[in-house]
Each structure stands twice: as C-alpha cells, then as structure tokens.
C-alpha cells in the first residue's frame, strides 16, 4: 500500500552517537537585511524575505512588462 512505510535500515549507518551529541555554537550570526522577513507580518502574512519577494517578480518576468509597455508606446 502507498500509505505504508518501508524501512530498510540504511539511514542507521549515517547517524552515530557523535553526530547525535553534536551541538551548534550559540553565537550571533550576521544576516543580510534583504534576507530578513518583513517586520510587519500583520499586512497579509507573507513570510518571504525581501530577496524572495524580488525573485517572485523575476520568476514571473513581470519586470519586463513595464519595459515592453514603455517601448511599444514610443
């Protein structure tokens, strides 16, 4: 059945006691401002960073829409 998980045990070789006990350091990490999410989450709940929001425009090629309208109008 699709809802049943088949376990073959291969992942057990990847995890050992040293890996399980390994901890990340507690230090401040510098994050660029364009990678941070919007500080005001009350305006729609978008959790994308500024960079991710800019990438959406590029993914849809909407930045060329303005260029095409202004060049065809001349």
From Swiss-Prot:
Belongs to the APC13 family. GO terms for cellular component: anaphase-promoting complex. This is Anaphase-promoting complex subunit 13. GO terms for biological process: anaphase-promoting complex-dependent catabolic process; cell division; protein branched polyubiquitination; protein K11-linked ubiquitination; protein K48-linked ubiquitination. InterPro entries: Apc13. The APC/C is composed of at least 12 subunits. Pathway: Protein modification; protein ubiquitination. Component of the anaphase promoting complex/cyclosome (APC/C), a cell cycle-regulated E3 ubiquitin ligase that controls progression through mitosis and the G1 phase of the cell cycle. The APC/C complex acts by mediating ubiquitination and subsequent degradation of target proteins: it mainly mediates the formation of 'Lys-11'-linked polyubiquitin chains and, to a lower extent, the formation of 'Lys-48'- and 'Lys-63'-linked polyubiquitin chains. The APC/C complex catalyzes assembly of branched 'Lys-11'-/'Lys-48'-linked branched ubiquitin chains on target proteins. It is found in: Nucleus. It comes from the Eukaryota. Keywords: Cell cycle, Cell division, Mitosis, Nucleus, Ubl conjugation pathway.
């Amino acid at each position: 059945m699709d809802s049943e998980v088949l376990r073959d045990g291969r992942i057990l070789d990847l995890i050992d006691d040293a890996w399980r006990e390994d901890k990340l350091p507690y230090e401040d990490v510098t994050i660029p401002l364009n990678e941070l999410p919007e500080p005001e989450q009350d305006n729609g709940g978008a959790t994308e960073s500024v960079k991710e929001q800019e990438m959406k425009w590029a993914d849809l090629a909407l930045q060329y829409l303005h260029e095409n309208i202004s060049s065809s109008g001349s």
